[in-house]
C-alpha cells in the first residue's frame, strides 16, 4: 500500500499528494571526448576524467534547457561550448561501425524530461551530448564562461558592493587549513618550502581546544567580524597573463563567410602572446600577431583546434593546465561547496567592514558589454527587457498541478530577483544625473525616468499630493507602504489582478521608486476604455455599460478639460475622492482582496455628491492597461489609519520631558497607518472572544433545557428522556461566517479637495468619521488594542524572558511581526521603566519573579539605541543628500566622528575635497560638531518617538561600537576592515587589512617550533580573541602616513550600497510541502513526514536556488528535525537492545527498528553547516539569524562528537554577541553555558568550571541572586564544582539554588526536590571526605617522623579531588561524568546522578 494513503493530508496542503510520475530519477549522459587532454595528464594535473556515462539526478518537470544549465555549471561539463542533446536510435541495428552508437535527431531544448523518457525504463534513460556549430552568441558566452571561471572569487569593481556574499564559516571551523594555505605563499606570492608547510601542519595538529584557557569573556573588536585567517583575500592561481578580445575584431566580411566569429588575444604564463580564432567549428590558434593579421590556423598541428577554448589553452600551455587544475580543485570549494555557488535569486549581503582589494588590470572587463550583447553600434543594441510583460506572463502561467505550480514559482522568483538587481544598478545612475528625465522642465523631485524599461521616480512629494499630510515626509512613508501593499497582494495571488514590479531603493540620502512600466500608461483614455470587457464574466459587467455611456458622460468625454478625466484609471479615486470611477470587474477582484484583509465595503462620496461603493481605500486605483490586463496601483493605504496617534501624539506629550512640546516637536507627518499584522492579531482575538461567548451561551441554554427536562421528568414519576444526553455528546460546532469584523480603510482619513473660497484654493476634509458604523468603530478599537493590549503584552513577554532582541534590526522585525509600528519605540521604552510596571500583565510578571528587571533593562538599552540609530539615519540622510560625489566619503567619515568618535576627538574637523568646481564653504555637513549632532538626535527622537533621552545616555549608556555597526548596515556604508578606536587614544599607525597590508602576521605563533610553543600558543589565542597584533614587516613596507587625529578618515569609507526593499512574494508551494511533512511527523507517520520534508527542501532549492535566505531557514529547520528524529531513533534502538538483554534474547540487526538513511547526526550537521554558509552570504556575517545558525551548529557538532568544531563555532557565537550587543545580554548566559557544557563533555572540568563561573557571575549581574535564572545557573555551577572535586563550594552554591527554587517554585516542585537531593548527597560526601581526611591525619601522626612527609600523597581528600579534577587517577579515566559524580558521592544516591543527567540533556 502506498504510504501516502495511510495518513490524511493536512487541510489546505497539497504537498502530500505525491505523484510517482513526478519523483526524481537518474539519467545517463554521455559527454564528448577531450583529445587535447590525455588521460595521463588529466590525472597528473588533477583535472577530472570525463565520466562515461555521467549520472545526473533530474526531476520530470525539468526541461532540457534546465539540464543544459546544470551541465555547464558542473565540474564535468564546464568546458563544453555549443552542444545539443540527442537520443540513441531505438532500432535493433543502432550500433554503427567501431561500436559507436547511432544517434537520432536533436531533442528540442524546451521539452520536459518526462515527455522525452515517456515509456522508457528507468535504467535505459540516456542522452548523448554532441558538439554543434557555434554562432557568435555561443562563442561570446563561451569566452565569458572562461573569464568567470578564471577570475574565481576576484573582486568585481562593477558590483554594487565590496566582498559581496562573503562567507567565513570555513575559516571559523578550519582555521588551521587557512593558516596552511597562507603558509604556502609569502608576502610576495612566492611558494615557501615544503618544510615550512609541514611545520605549520604539525603545529596546527597540536593546537589545544579553543576556549580551554578561559579567563573571562574574550576581547573582541570590530575587526573580528572577519576571522583573522580570512582577512587577507585568498590568492587564487593565475592561469593566463592576459585574456581579451583582439583588436582585429570584428572579422572582415570575407572572413565571416569562412565562419569566423571572434578573434581573441591570450598572454600565456610561458610569456607567449597568441591570437585565437573563434569560428563556427570551434577555436584554433591562428598566425596573427599584434602587427599582422592572418587568421588562418597555424601549421603542423600547432593550431590546437578544439570545440572548447578551455581544452585549447590546456593543450597549448602546460602552465595553464597546471594552474587551472589547482583552481579547479580549490580545497575551499570541496570543504564548503555553498560558499562558491553563485548567488542568483537574491541580493547578496555586503559586510559593513570590507577588505580593500588590490585592483588588477583586466582588458576583458571593459569588453564585457560586447560579450553580453554583441553590439558594436547603437542600432545593434538589443531591445531592453519588458519587465512588466515578463512578470505578468509568469503570473498567468498555469498552476493547476504540482509541477505547474513549481515551474510558476521558479519563474516568478527568478524574474523578481533580476528585476530587483536591475533596479538596484539603475537608480545610482539616475541619481548621478546620467539619465535624461522624461519631464526635464519640472522640478527635480517631480522628474520621472525610464531606464531599461524601469519607471523610476523619487519618493518625495514632487507633485504636491501630500502637503496636508506632511509633504516629503509623508511621501517617504507612502512609497514604503506601497511596496508592502504590493507584496501583500503578491502573496494573496488573486487571479486576474495584475501588480507592477515595485521596489524602493534608498541611495545617498534619497528614496527612489522603481516600477515596471504599465502598457499605455501615458496614452489618452478613449471611450473604448469605458466599455466593459466582452469576456462574459458576469451580467454585472453588461449592466455597467449603459451607465458609462450616458449623455452626460459623453458630453464630459467630448469636453475634457480636467487632467483627472484623461487617465487610464477606471476604478477608484483618480486623485483623492473628488473624481471616483466605478468598474464592476475591478470591484469583484477587490472584493477577494478585502475578504482576506478584513476590509469593509463602504460608500465614498465624490465632488458631485455621488456615492461610490469601494472595497479598498479610495486612493487604490484600478487601471486598464493597453494590453487588456487589469492593474492595481497606489496601495499605500491598504490598511486603516492609527487614529489614536493622530489624535493624541501628533503634538502630544513627550515622555521624560518636564516641559511641554513646542512646534519643533510636531510629528513630521500624518501618514500613520496600522500594520496588517495588528489587524490580523486583533481580528483573531475578537474571534476567540466571540467563539467563547457563543459556546458559553450554548452551554447556558443547554443547561436550562436540561433543567426543564429534568423537572418535567420528575413530574412524570421519574421517567427520563435520553434526548438531552444524546445532544450533550454531540461536538460543539460554530459557523465562523457568522462572525463579522471588518475595517473601513478610509475611516478618519484626511483628504485635500478643491475649494475656490479657501486661501490656497483647497481644503482638508475628513468625510468618514461616523463611529455608529461598526467598520469605522473597529478602526478605533484596533488602534486602542495596539496601545492597551499589543504593546504591553510585547513588553511583558520580554520581562518573562520569552523574547530578547539581539540588535535593533531584530527588535524592529519582532515589533512588526506583533503589529507594532516603530513609531511606538518611545512608548515601549516607557513601559520598560519601573514606573510603568503596573501597566504590564501582572500575572506573568508575578510568575517571572525577581530578575525580570534584567531582561527589561537590557531590552530598554536596545530600544534607546534603536531610537538613536533611526534618528542618526535621518540626520545623515539630510546631510548627504546634496553632497557632491567627491565629498561623500568625507561627509560620512565626519558624521561618524561626531556620532561615535567624539571620545577620541571632541572637536573633529571636516576634510572636504576642494576643487575648482566644488563649493563646500557653506555645506551643512562641514559645520557639524558632536554637540550639535547630539542636539539634532535628541530633537529627532522627541519629534518621532515622543520620548526624551536620559541626560546621561550619550556618556554612559551609548554602545558606540554597536551603534557604528548598525548605522553602517542600515545606511549601506562599507568601511575598510580595520580596528576603529572609539574610546581612548589613537595608535600611531593604522591597522588596515588589505591585499598589501594584512594587519596580522601571515603565519602566527602556531606554526613555530615546539620550544616556544607555550608562549606562542598564548599569543595565538589572544590574537583570535580580538587583541590587535602589529605586523612590523607590513608596517615597514607601507609608505609613511601622518598619525590619525580622528577615529575615521575619508579613506576609510569604501563604498555606499543601495538599500533595497522589494515586493518579491514567498513560494507557498515550498512552504506547504515542508509544513505537510512536519504535520505528518507530529501525527506519528515518520517515514511519510521525512519524505515530504525532503520534497519541501527540494522545492525550496528549485524555487529560490541554493543560496537564498529562505533556503537557509529551510536547511536549519530540517537539520533540527533530523537531529531530533535521529535521537528518537537511537533511543528506540537502545531500548530494543536493552529489552532483549533483559530477556536474555539474542538480537540481530533485522530485529532492530529500521532507521531511515537520512536520519543521522552527520546529515543534520551537514544541513546546518549549509544553513550557516547561506545565511552568511545572503543575510550577513553578523546578522542575528546567522548568530542563531551558529548556535544551532555548535549544538549539533557537539551531539555528533565534534568537540573542536563545536567550540570553534561557540567562539564565533561569543564574537558575534560582542559585535551585536556586547556581553551583558541575557542570551549570553546561554552561550556561556553551552561552552561550559561542551568542555565538560570533553572532560575538561577545570575549564568548564571557569566558564560556568563566568555565566553565573553574569546571571548575578543581570538578574540578581533571587532570580530563578540565577538559580538554574547555580545548579549547573554546583555540578561543575562537584566534577572538579570542590565539594565544599559545590554544597554552598547548591544550597543557594535550593533556596531560590523553594521560594519561587515551592517544596513540591521537581526541580526543588532534585536540588534538595543533590544537597543531601553533597553533604554526605563532604562528611565522608572529612572522615577520610581525619583518618589520614591520624595515620600520619602514628607514623615515624622520617616517613610522614612521603605518606600524605595518596589519601583523603586529595585522592578524591584529584579524581574529580583530572579524571585520570584511581581508575576514573574511562568513567562517564555520572560515574565520576557517583564516585565522589561514595556510590550512594544514584538517582541524583540520573537526575543530573536529565538536567544536562535538557540544557542541550
UniProtKB/Swiss-Prot annotation:
Pfam families in UniProt: CLU, CLU_N, eIF3_p135, TPR_10, TPR_12
Keywords, in A-Z order: Cytoplasm
GO biological process per UniProt: intracellular distribution of mitochondria; mitochondrion organization
Protein name as it appears in the record: Clustered mitochondria protein homolog
Organism of derivation: Mycosarcoma maydis
Acidic residues bias (residue ranges): 528-540
Task of the protein: mRNA-binding protein involved in proper cytoplasmic distribution of mitochondria.
SUPFAM superfamilies documented for this protein: Hypothetical protein c14orf129, hspc210, TPR-like
Gene3D superfamilies: Tetratricopeptide repeat domain
Subcellular location: Cytoplasm
Domain of life of the source: Eukaryota
Record keyword Cytoplasm present: yes
Comp. bias regions, Basic and acidic residues: 706-723
Quaternary structure annotation from Swiss-Prot or TrEMBL: May associate with the eukaryotic translation initiation factor 3 (eIF-3) complex.
Coiled coil: none
Amino acid at each position: 500500500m502506498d504510504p501516502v494513503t495511510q495518513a490524511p493530508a493536512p487541510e489546505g496542503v497539497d504537498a502530500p499528494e505525491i505523484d510517482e510520475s513526478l519523483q526524481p530519477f537518474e539519467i545517463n549522459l554521455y559527454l564528448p571526448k577531450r583529445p587535447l587532454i590525455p588521460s595521463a595528464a588529466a590525472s597528473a594535473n588533477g583535472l577530472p576524467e570525463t565520466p562515461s556515462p555521467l549520472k545526473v539526478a533530474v526531476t520530470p518537470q525539468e526541461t532540457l534547457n534546465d539540464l543544459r544549465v546544470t551541465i555547464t555549471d558542473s565540474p564535468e561539463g564546464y568546458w563544453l561550448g555549443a552542444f545539443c542533446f540527442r537520443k540513441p536510435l531505438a532500432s535493433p541495428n543502432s550500433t554503427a561501425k567501431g561500436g559507436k552508437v547511432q544517434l537520432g535527431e536533436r531533442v528540442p531544448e524546451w521539452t520536459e524530461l518526462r515527455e522525452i523518457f515517456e515509456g522508457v525504463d528507468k535504467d535505459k534513460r540516456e542522452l548523448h551530448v554532441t558538439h554543434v556549430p557555434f554562432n557568435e552568441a555561443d562563442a561570446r558566452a563561451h569566452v565569458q564562461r572562461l573569464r568567470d571561471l578564471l577570475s574565481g572569487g576576484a573582486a568585481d569593481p562593477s558590483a554594487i558592493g565590496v566582498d559581496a556574499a562573503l562567507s567565513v564559516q570555513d575559516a571559523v571551523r578550519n582555521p588551521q587549513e587557512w593558516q596552511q594555505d597562507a603558509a604556502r605563499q609569502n608576502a610576495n606570492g612566492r611558494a615557501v618550502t615544503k618544510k615550512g608547510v609541514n611545520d605549520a601542519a604539525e603545529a596546527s595538529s597540536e593546537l589545544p581546544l579553543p576556549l580551554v584557557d578561559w579567563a573571562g569573556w574574550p576581547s573582541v573588536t570590530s575587526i573580528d567580524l572577519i576571522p583573522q585567517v580570512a582577512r587577507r583575500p585568498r590568492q587564487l592561481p593565475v592561469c593566463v597573463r592576459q585574456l581579451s578580445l583582439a583588436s582585429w575584431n570584428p572579422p572582415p566580411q570575407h572572413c565571416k563567410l569562412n565562419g569566423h566569429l571572434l578573434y581573441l588575444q591570450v598572454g600565456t604564463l610561458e610569456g607567449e602572446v597568441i591570437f585565437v580564432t573563434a569560428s563556427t567549428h570551434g577555436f584554433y590558434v591562428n598566425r596573427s600577431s599584434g602587427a599582422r593579421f592572418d587568421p588562418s590556423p597555424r601549421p603542423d598541428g600547432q593550431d590546437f583546434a578544439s570545440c572548447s577554448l578551455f581544452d585549447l589553452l590546456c593543450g597549448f600551455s602546460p602552465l595553464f593546465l597546471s594552474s587551472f587544475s589547482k583552481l579547479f580543485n580549490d580545497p575551499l570549494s570541496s570543504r564548503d561547496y555553498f560558499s562558491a555557488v553563485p548567488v542568483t535569486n537574491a541580493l547578496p549581503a555586503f559586510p559593513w567592514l570590507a577588505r580593500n582589494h588590490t585592483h588588477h588590470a583586466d582588458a576583458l572587463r571593459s569588453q564585457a558589454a560586447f560579450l553580453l550583447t554583441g553590439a558594436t553600434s547603437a542600432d545593434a543594441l538589443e531591445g531592453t527587457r519588458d519587465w512588466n510583460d515578463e512578470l505578468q506572463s509568469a503570473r498567468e502561467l498555469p498552476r493547476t498541478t504540482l509541477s505547474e505550480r513549481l515551474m510558476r514559482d521558479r519563474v516568478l522568483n527568478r524574474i523578481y530577483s533580476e528585476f530587483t538587481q536591475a533596479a538596484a544598478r539603475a537608480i545610482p545612475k539616475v541619481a548621478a544625473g546620467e539619465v535624461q528625465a522624461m519631464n526635464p522642465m519640472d522640478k527635480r523631485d517631480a522628474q520621472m525616468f525610464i531606464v531599461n524599461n524601469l519607471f523610476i521616480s523619487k519618493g518625495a512629494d514632487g507633485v504636491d499630493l501630500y502637503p496636508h499630510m506632511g509633504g516629503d515626509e509623508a511621501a517617504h512613508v507612502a512609497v514604503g507602504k506601497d511596496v508592502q501593499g504590493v507584496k501583500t497582494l503578491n502573496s494573496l495571488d488573486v487571479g486576474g489582478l495584475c501588480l507592477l514590479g515595485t521596489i524602493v531603493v534608498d541611495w545617498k540620502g534619497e528614496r527612489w521608486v522603481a516600477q515596471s512600466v504599465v502598457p499605455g500608461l501615458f496614452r489618452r483614455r478613449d471611450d473604448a476604455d469605458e466599455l466593459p470587457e466582452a469576456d462574459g464574466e458576469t451580467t454585472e459587467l453588461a449592466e455597467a455599460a449603459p451607465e458609462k455611456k450616458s449623455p452626460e458622460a459623453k458630453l464630459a468625454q467630448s469636453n475634457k478639460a480636467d487632467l483627472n478625466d484623461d487617465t487610464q484609471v477606471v476604478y477608484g479615486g483618480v486623485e483623492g475622492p473628488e473624481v471616483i470611477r466605478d468598474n464592476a470587474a475591478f470591484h469583484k477582484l477587490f472584493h477577494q482582496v478585502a475578504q482576506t484583509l478584513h476590509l469593509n465595503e463602504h460608500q465614498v462620496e465624490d465632488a458631485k455628491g455621488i456615492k461610490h461603493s469601494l472595497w479598498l481605500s479610495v486612493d487604490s486605483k484600478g487601471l486598464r492597461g493597453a494590453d487588456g490586463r487589469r492593474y492595481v496601483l497606489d496601495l499605500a493605504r491598504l490598511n486603516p489609519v492609527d487614529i489614536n496617534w493622530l489624535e493624541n501624539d501628533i503634538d502630544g506629550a513627550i515622555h521624560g520631558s518636564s516641559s511641554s512640546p513646542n512646534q519643533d516637536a510636531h510629528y513630521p507627518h500624518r501618514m500613520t497607518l496600522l500594520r496588517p499584522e495588528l489587524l490580523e492579531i486583533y481580528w483573531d482575538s475578537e474571534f476567540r472572544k466571540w467563539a467563547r461567548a457563543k459556546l458559553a451561551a450554548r452551554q447556558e441554554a443547554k443547561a436550562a433545557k436540561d433543567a426543564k427536562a429534568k423537572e418535567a421528568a420528575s413530574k412524570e414519576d421519574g421517567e427520563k428522556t435520553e434526548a438531552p444526553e444524546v445532544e450533550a455528546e454531540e461536538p460543539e460546532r460554530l459557523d465562523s461566517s457568522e462572525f463579522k469584523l471588518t475595517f473601513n480603510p478610509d475611516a478618519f482619513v484626511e483628504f485635500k479637495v478643491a475649494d475656490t473660497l479657501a486661501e490656497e484654493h483647497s481644503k482638508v476634509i475628513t468625510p468618514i468619521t461616523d463611529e455608529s458604523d461598526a467598520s469605522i468603530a473597529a478602526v478605533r478599537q484596533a488602534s486602542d488594542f495596539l496601545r492597551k493590549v499589543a504593546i504591553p503584552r510585547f513588553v511583558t513577554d520580554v520581562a518573562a524572558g520569552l523574547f530578547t532582541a539581539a540588535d535593533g534590526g531584530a527588535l524592529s522585525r519582532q515589533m512588526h511581526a506583533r503589529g507594532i509600528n516603530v513609531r511606538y519605540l518611545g512608548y515601549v521604552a516607557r513601559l520598560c521603566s519601573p514606573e510603568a510596571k503596573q501597566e504590564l500583565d501582572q500575572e506573568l510578571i508575578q510568575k517571572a519573579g525577581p530578575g525580570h528587571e534584567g531582561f527589561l533593562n537590557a531590552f530598554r538599552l536596545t530600544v534607546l539605541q534603536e531610537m538613536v540609530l533611526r534618528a542618526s539615519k535621518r540626520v545623515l540622510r539630510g546631510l548627504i543628500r546634496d553632497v557632491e560625489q567627491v565629498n561623500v566619503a568625507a561627509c560620512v567619515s565626519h558624521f561618524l566622528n561626531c556620532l561615535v568618535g567624539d571620545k577620541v576627538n571632541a572637536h573633529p574637523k571636516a576634510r572636504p575635497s576642494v576643487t575648482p568646481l566644488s563649493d563646500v564653504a557653506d555645506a551643512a555637513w562641514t559645520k557639524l560638531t558632536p554637540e550639535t549632532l547630539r542636539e539634532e538626535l535628541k530633537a529627532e527622537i522627541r519629534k518621532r518617538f515622543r520620548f526624551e533621552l536620559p541626560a546621561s545616555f550619550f556618556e554612559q549608556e551609548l554602545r558606540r561600537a554597536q551603534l557604528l555597526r548598525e548605522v553602517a548596515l542600515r545606511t549601506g556604508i562599507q568601511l575598510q576592515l580595520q580596528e576603529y578606536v572609539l574610546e581612548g587614544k589613537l595608535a600611531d599607525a593604522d591597522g588596515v587589512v588589505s591585499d598589501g597590508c594584512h594587519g596580522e602576521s601571515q603565519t602566527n605563533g602556531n606554526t613555530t617550533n615546539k620550544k616556544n610553543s607555550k608562549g606562542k600558543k598564548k599569543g595565538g589565542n589572544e590574537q583570535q580573541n580580538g587583541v590587535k597584533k602589529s605586523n612590523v614587516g607590513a608596517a615597514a613596507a607601507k609608505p609613511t602616513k601622518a598619525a590619525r587625529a580622528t577615529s575615521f578618515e575619508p579613506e576609510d569609507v569604501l563604498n555606499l550600497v543601495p538599500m533595497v526593499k522589494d515586493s518579491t512574494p514567498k513560494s507557498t508551494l515550498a512552504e506547504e510541502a515542508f509544513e505537510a511533512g512536519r504535520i505528518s511527523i507530529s501525527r506519528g507517520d515518520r517515514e511519510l513526514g521525512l519524505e515530504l520534508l525532503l520534497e519541501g527542501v527540494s522545492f525550496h532549492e528549485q524555487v529560490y536556488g541554493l543560496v537564498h535566505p529562505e533556503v537557509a531557514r529551510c536547511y536549519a529547520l530540517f537539520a533540527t528535525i533530523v537531529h531530533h528524529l535521529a535521537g528518537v531513533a537511537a533511543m528506540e534502538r537502545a531500548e530494543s537492545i536493552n529489552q532483549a538483554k533483559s530477556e536474555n534474547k539474542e538480537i540481530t540487526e533485522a530485529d532492530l527498528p529500521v532507521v531511515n538513511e537520512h536520519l543521522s547526526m552527520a546529515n543534520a550537521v551537514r544541513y546546518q553547516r549549509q544553513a550557516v554558509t547561506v545565511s552568511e552570504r545572503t543575510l550577513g556575517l553578523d546578522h542575528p539569524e546567522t548568530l542563531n545558525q551558529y548556535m544551532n551548529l555548535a549544538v549539533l557538532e557537539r551531539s555528533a562528537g565534534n568537540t573542536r568544531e563545536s567550540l570553534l563555532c561557540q567562539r564565533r557565537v561569543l564574537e558575534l554577541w560582542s559585535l551585536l550587543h556586547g556581553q551583558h545580554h541575557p542570551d549570553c548566559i546561554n552561550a556561556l553555558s553551552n561552552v561550559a557544557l561542551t568542555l565538560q563533555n570533553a572532560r575538561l572540568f577545570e575549564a568548564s568550571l571557569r566558564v560556568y563561573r563566568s555565566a553565573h557571575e553574569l546571571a548575578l549581574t543581570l538578574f540578581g541572586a533571587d532570580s530563578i535564572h540565577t538559580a538554574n545557573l547555580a545548579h549547573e555551577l554546583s555540578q561543575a564544582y562537584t566534577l572538579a572535586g570542590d565539594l565544599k563550594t559545590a554544597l554552598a552554591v547548591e544550597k543557594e539554588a535550593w533556596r531560590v527554587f523553594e521560594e519561587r517554585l515551592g517544596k513540591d516542585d521537581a526541580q526543588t526536590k532534585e536540588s534538595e537531593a543533590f544537597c543531601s548527597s553533597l553533604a554526605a560526601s563532604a562528611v565522608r571526605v572529612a572522615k577520610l581526611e581525619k583518618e589520614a591525619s591520624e595515620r600520619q601522626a602514628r607514623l615515624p617522623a622520617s616517613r610522614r612527609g612521603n605518606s600524605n600523597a595518596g589519601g583523603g581528600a586529595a585522592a578524591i579531588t584529584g579524581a574529580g579534577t583530572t579524571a585520570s587517577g584511581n581508575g576514573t579515566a574511562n568513567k562517564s561524568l555520572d560515574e565520576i559524580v557517583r564516585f565522589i558521592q561514595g556510590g550512594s544516591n544514584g538517582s541524583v546522578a540520573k537526575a543530573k543527567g536529565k538536567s544536562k540533556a535538557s540544557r542541550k
